[in-house]
């Protein structure tokens, strides 16, 4: 088959959305029209719910992709837990998600190596592909449990994940171990630290990739668009959730570049987008997924993505754009970007560096946020409300291991010593 003669033009501005029977979906579609969104990744309980929703969206000129959880169960979780407890993912300690919890109760990931699991997923995808009018399939939770959570989530669970720990390191189902030993001649558990074994990590990534590409084959056989919502970059995702999505046969990708989960600075979006331009599958059109911000940061984030190679935006979710002023600005923004895309032959041309800068000290926004946090700590210790002025000395590196870089710096004004730790997954300052 020859190369495509023309690039398919996908909707440019998207939202993810949960759909439930009885909701006023028509009014949401009207709001999407009003602010310039033309694509929706819809999560509905059954194929019949999509059959009800699609005509409403199409009336408003909005394309609909079925937003489907794959390796993690959703609507059929309790049924499968009861009928097939042997299907569930196992961690390095030998604990199965069939009878243990990782972070939250709804994390019930399946083992991708099992033929029965693959067949179950394939039949599920087929059932949604048979929905007339559905434009595409967007897979989510297509991965293992997070061996490392984004840094801002650690306090919520009372944890520090400065390296890979056994309780959150999944992929040790007996069938996974059997297949790996068959291919490589050893059991990864025999090593002092299996997390350092690149072959074992890549093997788990490849199992997830095989299932993704099986899904893509089904989706394409129905003439529909194949999409996914993975972690921020292939390198980060491979480390954090075993999701090497640059190898997936996607038509369009919506990486979840949620800066508030990581550094809190829009430079995270710029860096990830630069890395994604480099590492995505050549056949895949790159978009950027981001959290909704009801203020100026929304537009700074979209600029960071579109100026560095993304071809469009997905917002989680439209409900986060609340103020009339932000909605007006969003509409003006979408109109202006579409004009630029049309003038450039259907693509957003961007000038961006070859690689992201992994030096945290060169990221002004990250350093500013960190110094504000230091000022808050000093003021609180002194019983004051006003932020304290800083006189920081030199940052001294005190430790470095895996993706972790540890520094100390002294504030001469308060004589406070701060421990500062940066995390770098892939080529991106991640937290």
Task: Label the model's feature ranges.
Residues 138, 201-239, 284-293:
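Aromatic-lined carbohydrate-recognition surfaces of secreted/lumenal glycan-active proteins
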Residues 66, 70-127:
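Active-site-adjacent "subsite" loops/lids of carbohydrate-active enzymes
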Residues 18-32, 118-127, 235-246, 295-304:
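Short, acidic/polar
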Residues 2-26:
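Boundary/entry segment of secreted carbohydrate-active catalytic domains
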Residues 16, 37-44, 103-119, 197-207, ...:
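The substrate-binding groove and active-site-proximal loops of carbohydrate-active enzymes
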Residues 255-266, 287-353:
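Substrate-binding cleft of secreted/luminal carbohydrate-active enzymes
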Residues 22-46, 132:
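Catalytic domains of carbohydrate-active enzymes, especially glycoside hydrolases
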Residues 225-263:
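Substrate-binding cleft/loops of secretory-pathway carbohydrate-active enzymes
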């Amino acid at each position: 088959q020859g190369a495509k003669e023309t690039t398919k033009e996908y909707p440019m501005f998207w939202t993810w959305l949960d759909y439930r029977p009885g909701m006023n979906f028509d009014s949401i579609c009207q709001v999407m029209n009003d602010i310039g969104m033309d694509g929706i990744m819809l999560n509905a309980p059954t194929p019949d719910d999509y059959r009800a929703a699609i005509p409403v969206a199409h009336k408003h000129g909005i394309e609909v992709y079925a937003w489907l959880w794959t390796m993690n169960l959703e609507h059929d979780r309790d049924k499968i837990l009861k009928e097939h407890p042997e299907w569930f993912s196992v961690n390095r300690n030998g604990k199965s998600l069939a009878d243990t919890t990782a972070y939250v109760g709804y994390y019930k990931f399946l083992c991708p190596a099992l033929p029965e699991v693959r067949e179950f997923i394939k039949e599920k995808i087929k059932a949604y592909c048979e929905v007339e009018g559905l434009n595409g399939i967007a897979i989510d939770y297509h991965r293992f449990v997070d061996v490392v959570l984004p840094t801002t989530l650690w306090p919520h669970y009372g944890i520090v994940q400065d390296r890979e720990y056994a309780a959150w390191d999944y992929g040790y189902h007996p069938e996974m171990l059997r297949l790996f030993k068959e291919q490589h001649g050893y059991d990864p558990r025999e090593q002092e630290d299996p997390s350092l074994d690149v072959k074992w990590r890549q093997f788990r990534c490849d199992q997830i990739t095989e299932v993704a590409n099986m899904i893509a084959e089904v989706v394409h056989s129905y003439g529909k668009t194949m999409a996914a919502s993975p972690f921020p970059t292939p390198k980060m995702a491979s480390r954090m959730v075993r999701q090497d999505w640059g190898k997936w046969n996607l038509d369009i990708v919506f990486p979840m570049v949620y800066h508030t989960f990581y550094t809190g600075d829009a430079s995270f979006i710029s860096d990830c987008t630069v890395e994604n331009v480099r590492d995505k599958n050549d056949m895949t059109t790159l978009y950027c997924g981001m959290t909704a911000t009801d203020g100026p940061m929304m537009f700074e984030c979209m600029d960071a993505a579109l100026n560095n190679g993304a071809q469009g935006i997905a917002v989680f979710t439209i409900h986060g754009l609340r103020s009339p002023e932000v909605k007006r600005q969003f509409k003006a923004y979408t109109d202006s970007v579409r004009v630029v895309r049309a003038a450039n032959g259907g693509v957003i041309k961007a000038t961006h560096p070859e690689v992201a800068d992994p030096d945290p000290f060169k990221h002004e926004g990250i350093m500013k946020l960190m110094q504000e946090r230091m000022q808050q700590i000093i003021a609180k210790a002194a019983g004051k409300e006003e932020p304290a002025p800083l006189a920081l000395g030199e940052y001294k590196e005190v430790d470095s291991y895996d993706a972790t870089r540890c520094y100390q710096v002294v504030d001469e004004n308060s004589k406070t010593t701060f421990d500062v730790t940066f995390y770098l997954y892939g080529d991106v300052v991640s937290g």
